[in-house]
Amino acid sequence: DNILYSSEVLHENQYISYGPYEFIMQHDCNLVLYESGNPTWASNTGGLALHCRATLQTDGNLVVQNSANRIIWQSNTGTGTNGDYLLVLQKNGNVVIVGPPIWATGTGR
């Protein structure tokens, strides 16, 4: 799957992927985007803590937290408004956070 939904968590060694891309919460607490096994982006939090997890919060902020729930890195994208946010690993290797729809038919079941 290439999507992380609001409140979903990537624990150690869990990832989302799309084609040659993998966005993984490593065991060393570094959140890294790989293309074909080569790192292309990182949170640079490797070695700062143990047993970390990455969470997409309900306000749209992506955070890396240690086992004591302390935030050691964040995307600083919190909107102050809770909603249905998605972190998407796109087919071009870009990782984006998108927010609630601004219009819908209201026919979803």
UniProtKB/Swiss-Prot annotation:
Disulfide pattern: C29-C52
GO cellular component, as recorded: extracellular region
Subunit structure: Homotrimer or homotetramer.
Function as written in the Swiss-Prot or TrEMBL entry: Mannose-specific lectin. Shows agglutinating activity toward rabbit erythrocytes and mitogenic activity towards mouse lymphocytes.
Molecular function per GO: D-mannose binding
Coiled-coil intervals: none
Alphabetical UniProt keywords: Disulfide bond, Lectin, Mannose-binding, Secreted
Principal place of residence: secreted
Places the protein is found: Secreted
Span of domain Bulb-type lectin: 1-109
Source organism phylogeny: Eukaryota, Viridiplantae, Streptophyta, Embryophyta, Tracheophyta
GO biological process, one term: response to other organism
InterPro entries in the record: Bulb-type_lectin_dom, Bulb-type_lectin_dom_sf
Propeptide segment residues: 79-82
The name this protein goes by in its record: Mannose-specific lectin
